[in-house]
Amino acid sequence: MSFFHANQREALNQSLAELQGRINVSFEFFPPRTSDMEETLWSSIDRLSSLKPKFVSVTYGANSGERDRTHSIIKTIKERTGLEAAPHLTCIDASREQLREIAQDYWESGIRHIVALRGDLPQEGGKPDMYAADLVSLLKEVGDFDISVAAYPEVHPEAKSAQADLINLKHKIDAGANRAITQFFFDVESYLRFRDRCVATGIDVEIVPGILPVSNFKQLQKFATMTNVRVPNWMTTMFDGLDNDPETRKMVGASIAMDMVKILSREGVKDFHFYTLNRAELSYAICHTLGVRPDVAR
């Protein structure tokens, strides 16, 4: 390592030390499908809750069974941990009346934060009746929810252009959304350029970077293709030869994410959203690097 790069790393670590106690984190979970997965979920929630995250979110599936599990998990998180629990809510395959009922139920249950999404289109295609901006407007009619929406630094796969995608995000913010959480990414520059473009477009809410600590690189490559996320060549090289070495994969994945959050924090980012995949270890370790710890957390 050159003297210059050593100094850069030292400066990054020093800037992180100065931010201790001023970083906000949040975590995403998904509804488990088996009893073993449920045990892992609650173990992860219990461990990560000690970091006093700003909120935790739970994804929302297309089928009614998974939707019911989301409702149940959200209410249990609130009762069990006292954390702000934010359910994902999608408007695909649901009428306005159904969405209004769901939102009203959440409001009456004390849930005040919702992640509002359009959701995946059905396989048969067709134009949706509602978009995320419409859902944000509907939620604001029900109650003064704190609303998070999705943003795409590398452009949504269905968007006609980067500019059209940005205009769509602005519609969601103008409808009343309080923040945007990005799709995961690995090119930090793509996030920073996107943040600048948001400001230039008049989007004045926090653009929270979504961080995915990678433990299964092959699975990531498949998912990245579907979501239009670029996986840099250097990252492929770092995971090369680790197909049968899950422990080393975790260490590499954590190292990559730690470097990302260090650079982002230097660029003024103080809020991070972690896609945990229902596992605590990597997110917990990265938060420790950020200075978010049980004894110093907000």
From Swiss-Prot:
Binding site for (6S)-5-methyl-5,6,7,8-tetrahydrofolate: D120, Q183, Q219, R279
Annotated GO MF terms: FAD binding; methylenetetrahydrofolate reductase (NADH) activity
Positions contributing to FAD binding: Y60, A62, H88, R118, G119, D120, A132, Y152, H156, A159, D165, N168, K172
GO biological process entries: methionine biosynthetic process; tetrahydrofolate interconversion
GO cellular component: cytosol
Entry keyword set: Amino-acid biosynthesis, FAD, Flavoprotein, Methionine biosynthesis, NAD, Oxidoreductase
Cofactor(s) required, per the database record: FAD
Entry protein name: 5,10-methylenetetrahydrofolate reductase
